[in-house]
Amino acid sequence: MSVEQRVKEIIADQLGVEMEKITPEARFVDDLGADSLDVVELIMAFEEEFGVEIPDEDAEKIATVKDVLDYIKSKQG
């Protein structure tokens, strides 16, 4: 399974949104209805799933699905 597909599944599970709504440009808060706690839980789920650590200063910059995909791919090398 691709990183993108797994990220989308995590978002769908955590936020209860339909997969079709999870586009690279979708913003977690504005488009997918996440609140600040949801975002923290998403970051933790991404860290666990992909074996990366996302420091708070980096997490604050992650606002869209594309942001998290780019971040994970950059850390996986």
UniProtKB/Swiss-Prot annotation:
Family listed: Belongs to the acyl carrier protein (ACP) family.
GO terms assigned for molecular function: acyl binding; acyl carrier activity; phosphopantetheine binding
Pathway the protein contributes to: Lipid metabolism; fatty acid biosynthesis
O-(pantetheine 4'-phosphoryl)serine modified-residue sites: 36
Pfam family of the protein (one): PP-binding
Occurrences of domain Carrier (ranges): 1-76
Gene Ontology cellular component annotations, sorted alphabetically: cytosol; membrane
Name of the protein in its database record: Acyl carrier protein
Cytoplasm recorded as keyword: yes
PTM note: 4'-phosphopantetheine is transferred from CoA to a specific serine of apo-ACP by AcpS. This modification is essential for activity because fatty acids are bound in thioester linkage to the sulfhydryl of the prosthetic group.
Chief location: cytoplasm
One GO BP annotation of this record: lipid A biosynthetic process
Gene3D superfamilies xref list: ACP-like (1.10.1200.10)
Keywords for the protein's UniProt record, in alphabetical order: Cytoplasm, Fatty acid biosynthesis, Fatty acid metabolism, Lipid biosynthesis, Lipid metabolism, Phosphopantetheine, Phosphoprotein
Cited SUPFAM superfamilies: ACP-like
Keyword Lipid metabolism attached: yes
Described function: Carrier of the growing fatty acid chain in fatty acid biosynthesis.
Compartments, as annotated in UniProt: Cytoplasm
SMART domains: PKS_PP
